[in-house]
Amino acid sequence: METHLYSDLAFEARFADDEQLPLHLVLDQEVLSNEEAETLRYVYYRNVDSAGRSAGRVPSGDEDDAPASDDAEDAVGGDRAFDRERRTWQRACFRVLPRPLELLDYLRQSGLTVTLEKEQRVRMFYAVFTTLGLRCPDNRLSGAQTLHLRLVWPDGSYRDWEFLARDLLREEMEANKRDRQHQLATTTNHRRRGGLRNNLDNGSDRRLPEAAVASLETAVSTPFFEIPNGAGTSSANGGGRFSNLEQRVARLLRGDEEFIYHAGPLEPPSKIRGHELVQLRLDVNPDLMYATDPHDRDEVARTDEWKGAGVSRLREVWDVQHRVRLRVLWYVNSFWRSRELSYDDHEVELYRALDAYRARIAVEYVLIRAVRDEIYAVLRRDSGALPQRFACHVPRNMSWRVVWELCRHALALWMDRADVRSCIIKALTPRLSRGAAAAAQRARRQRERSAPKPQELLFGPRNESGPPAERTWYADVVRCVRTQVDLGVEVRAARCPRTGLWIVRDRRGRLRRWLSQPEVCVLYVTPDLDFYWVLPGGFAVSSRVTLHGLAQRALRDRFQNFEAVLARGMHVEAGRQEPETPRVSGRRLPFDDL
């Protein structure tokens, strides 16, 4: 609750410069595991319009004067497009509550008033409270824009989800519109009553219609134990009854003494039965001056107003692909309700937004399909003759017909289950993040290592003894019998000095025995984007992941994990370095870690 209140105040303070509507979200075990929730480091978000462009405020002075060429923008790691894309991300504050709770009970225990139309118990093993922003330029909200949420962990890994503004806002905007209409009708009724009171106070001689008299007689009835004068003669004189009622209504609205109840004089709040309880501060220190006039009304703290108004609605929202479900809390006193925001929900813009989203997420499937096609192309080119590249003992009487059938089914299963967690994406992400300068530096270091050294020219290459160097690879393990695919497994690979075959171990140094299992196929991808499709026995199809012909800008937008996200204290939207305030979490964050 405190995180949502703080974020709401922060959004209100910068609304004039950065118009955003705050969305107060709650993430639970359906989104993150317990370990992921406790080790969460950053929460970022950005808005993308219906055309697929990032809708963000770029700081003054940081814009590029000259447009970049198509070749420069299409190069992997293009720095200018990388910087422009980076500025659209904004950091959100969050709080981790690492204990079981019931959401509505937790809100009530925090002092909030919960007034839901239909209450439902929401049990959580742990919760992450955060607030994201939706762009509303010129007080206009579009249901076709997309909100991108990115969670980042200290090791550099991250997860992305996309949400349509239509799913987030439609029900709340309709409910808020009904509330405003009800409030407007109530204000209009009060204004009409005030006009009627003024007419009666001015002594208007106009007679009220009979329907108005009947409604006034129902609303303002006579006292229970009082018989009005002329009640017995009202039947004889019909006009006297209406005249008497008009007079009583006029006297009631005018505030005559006989209609006012007096409870007696009130004592000062500092006295009980005439005894002084606390000495006035002015008597203690005559030079003390009050900040406000004694007759000014007391100002209610914003926290008290927030808690008193409480929560009006609790909504469940799915992402575009229906993978995760978040909960949105709508507070009554959120500042945006007084801004009179307009909401547009055009079907044409929604279709454009969905087309842009499909084109964006299609990049990963294009990569996966390209790897599959390359595997089939290598098999056709080599006529099915595969060399053994990984160390594994194979029996002489092994049935290769079963192996080829397994290869076909394993490829189909991998195509069906692979997504952004695949080893291809994990190997590609660092290359997109390093940039053109880092790629040139890496190539220069490689040339220096490959160049012959002077001592090698004189004495020949040295024979260095020791264990072979290990390399970090990523693997997708396809288990055909269980129809299970383990995506993005990090492994260590080294060549056997005796046979020259690859030996694969896990991060703890334990030997991986996938190749000796007859129902398992493995796809390995190196950081240089070389891949091995390995069949049982260590026989592999080797080739390279080609990026030619792919939309490089879409690749960067989809998969790059820029260093600015992981830099400590970096304001991504402004690009300036400042000390970082510690996040609020269930455990204290030591300042030494900042």
Curated annotation (Swiss-Prot):
Annotated GO biological process: chromosome organization
Major subcellular location class: virion
Function as written in the Swiss-Prot or TrEMBL entry: Capsid vertex-specific component that plays a role during viral DNA encapsidation, assuring correct genome cleavage and presumably stabilizing capsids that contain full-length viral genomes.
Assembly and oligomerization: Interacts (via C-terminus) with capsid vertex component 2/CVC2.
Family, similarity comment: Belongs to the herpesviridae CVC1 protein family.
InterPro entries named in the record: UL17-like
Extent of Acidic residues compositional bias: 61-76
Region (Disordered): 52-77, 176-205, 443-467, 575-594
Keywords: Capsid protein, Host nucleus, Late protein, Viral genome packaging, Viral release from host cell, Virion
The keyword Membrane is assigned to this record: no
GO cellular component, one term: host cell nucleus
Subcellular location(s) of the protein: Virion; Host nucleus
Pfam families, alphabetized: Herpes_UL17
Protein name per UniProt: Capsid vertex component 1
Entry keyword annotation includes Ion transport: no
